[in-house]
């Protein structure tokens, strides 16, 4: 808390270059809590000193990993996401998601959990069916059965989504399956966030490959 209260914003510059369609960001030797390039002139001087030098690749590292679907929304995480994407205040987001609830297109909004209870699982296919005309991403999920089994043909039931121990009176915010007609522009945007987050929860985990390339120019 002390560090937050005493934080002083500072302007700094970053040095980047594109080489063979790849963006490289410079790592400069700096002292802790200090910035290497504190003025535009300093940055330009550095660029001029290395712009005619060759860029030497020093290492290439590839790592495979798994990217999981983001958790379903509780009220706080929805407010954060709406502020990030649409610059909505927390109060504005609450008013919009409350309106969507009153229109019966999303579930109760004032929740602090990102999980669903087990009794929701058998209802998922009907919810997906109700919003299929609005989201083409639903199509691959429609043939899946909510039978709790693992493997092809079954709707996933992940502990990252379903956990009775982490649900009290109300579960995470999800679509109800009612047709989301007659929504305002902002209501549509917030509804889409909720619906797409819900749909993503039933997609397979994404296998990703990250490549880190280190290069140097000059000494």
Give the positions of each predicted feature.
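Core catalytic DNA strand-manipulation module of type IA topoisomerases
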Residues: 1-219
């Amino acid at each position: 808390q002390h560090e937050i209260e005493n934080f002083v914003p500072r302007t700094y510059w970053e040095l980047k270059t594109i080489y063979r369609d790849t963006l490289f960001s410079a790592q400069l030797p700096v002292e802790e809590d200090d910035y290497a390039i504190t003025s535009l002139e300093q940055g330009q001087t550095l660029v001029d000193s290395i712009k005619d030098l060759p860029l030497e690749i020093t290492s290439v590292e590839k790592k495979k990993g798994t990217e999981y679907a983001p958790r379903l929304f509780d009220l706080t995480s929805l407010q954060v996401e709406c502020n990030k994407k649409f610059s909505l205040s927390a109060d504005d987001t609450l008013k919009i998601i409350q309106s969507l609830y009153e229109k019966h297109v999303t579930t109760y909004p004032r929740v602090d959990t990102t999980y669903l209870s087990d009794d929701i699982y058998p209802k998922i296919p009907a919810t997906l069916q109700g919003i299929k005309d609005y989201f083409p991403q639903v199509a691959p999920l429609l043939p899946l059965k909510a039978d709790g089994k693992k493997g092809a043909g079954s709707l996933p039931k992940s502990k990252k989504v379903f956990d009775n121990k982490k649900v009290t009176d109300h579960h995470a915010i999800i679509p109800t399956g009612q047709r989301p007609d007659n929504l305002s522009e902002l209501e549509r945007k917030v509804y889409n966030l909720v619906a797409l987050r819900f749909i993503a929860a039933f997609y397979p985990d994404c296998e990703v490959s990250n490549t880190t390339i280190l290069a140097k120019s000059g000494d």
